[in-house]
């Protein structure tokens, strides 16, 4: 008579949150974590540069608090938290988000379903925490990009992402030497994990709320210096031009179209017929991005969508500019060592 095998235990979750001057948003993050229906094995908070400007976690949360004397960036902070963790799954999320009551349960269930799943990540929800236009636009765009992305993902996102502990340490964690400030340390780690043949899943139903307030400068600074420039160098280093998320074919063509638009408008000052090229480029941009504009119209209405378009086109312009600068920098200064 064959004995019934005992059901396997669900993987233990270690929550790891890096925080730098977290303020009120971090308090909301902690409140949401305390309200979770499923409790993780442990909660590890890494205060990058100390607790100045960061609320003290309530003792009832039972969190392990690590502090660094000097800020070294989120990559190093997450690595420190991972070294302290003892769970099977390292669940990273940012200090300016709130998880849902069932978020931890969903993460646990995904890893319990497949032993071959190395990592997963989710997305922001469609109800950003801050009500100003740019915060709504920026966070809704992020939500849209992840919601149309491929579930069989080629990268990783630490804003709401989980990795098996053994996989994380197999690859040495986040590259804190290359990324000592907020950048694309999560994307770079995802590239390494995927290149080795591991499975990463984009779980579109695992959604968190982003509380960050976005303004004009914070958007351009983040997109240009912390994402587009280092991402360009990463793409060129790995020779990895993916057709997914922010680097899909429509986005690449949109970059070409926006530069065609700008150059033809400049040429029209001396040669007015160039305006026909400008009109064609504008039409092409609209057609290429019709789905995202339909998404914004459905979520926030026509007037909101009209205000989105110039910001979205500006995004393509400075992303293309960053690619050009990154290409030159890589060509002349990159050291393969």
Give the residues covered by each predicted segment:
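Short aromatic/hydrophobic "clamp" motif used to bind/position activated sugar donors
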Residues: 90
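Conserved donor NDP-sugar-binding/catalytic core segment of glycosyltransferases
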Residues: 102-134, 211
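Short, flexible, basic/aromatic active-site loop/helix in glycosyltransferases
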Residues: 119-124, 136-155
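Short, acidic, metal-binding catalytic loop of nucleotide-sugar glycosyltransferases
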Residues: 31-40
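Basic/Trp-rich segment in TM-proximal cytosolic loops or flexible interdomain/linker regions
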Residues: 212, 217-274, 297-306, 336-337
């Amino acid at each position: 008579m064959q004995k019934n095998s005992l059901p396997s235990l669900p993987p233990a979750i270690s929550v790891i949150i890096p925080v730098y001057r977290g303020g009120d948003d971090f308090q909301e993050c902690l409140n949401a974590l305390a309200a979770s229906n499923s409790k993780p094995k442990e909660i590890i908070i890494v205060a990058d540069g100390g607790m100045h400007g960061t609320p003290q976690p309530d003792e009832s949360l039972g969190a392990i608090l690590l502090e660094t004397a000097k800020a070294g960036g989120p990559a190093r902070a997450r690595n420190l938290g991972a070294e302290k963790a003892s769970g099977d799954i390292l669940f990273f999320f940012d200090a300016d988000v709130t998880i849902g009551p069932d978020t931890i349960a969903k993460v646990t269930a995904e890893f319990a379903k497949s032993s071959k799943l190395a990592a997963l990540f989710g997305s922001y929800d469609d109800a950003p925490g801050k009500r100003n236009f740019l915060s709504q636009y920026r966070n809704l765009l992020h939500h849209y990009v992840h919601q149309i992305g491929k579930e069989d993902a080629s990268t990783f996102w630490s804003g709401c992402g989980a990795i098996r502990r053994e996989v994380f340490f197999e690859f040495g964690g986040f590259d804190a030497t290359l990324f000592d400030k907020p950048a694309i340390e999560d994307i770079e780690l995802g590239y390494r994990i995927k290149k080795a043949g591991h499975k990463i899943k984009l779980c579109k139903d695992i959604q968190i709320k982003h509380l960050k307030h976005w303004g004009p400068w914070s958007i351009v600074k983040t997109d240009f210096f912390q994402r587009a420039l280092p991402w360009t160098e990463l793409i060129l280093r790995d020779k990895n031009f993916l057709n997914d998320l922010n680097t899909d074919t429509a986005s690449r063509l949109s970059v070409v179209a926006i530069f065609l638009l700008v150059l033809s408008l400049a040429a029209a000052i001396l040669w007015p017929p160039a305006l026909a090229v400008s009109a064609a480029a504008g039409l092409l941009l609209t057609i290429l991005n019709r789905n995202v504009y339909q998404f914004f119209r459905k979520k926030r209405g026509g007037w909101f969508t009209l205000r989105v378009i110039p910001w979205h086109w500006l995004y393509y312009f400075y992303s293309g500019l960053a690619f050009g600068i990154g290409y030159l920098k890589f060509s002349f200064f990159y050291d393969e060592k």
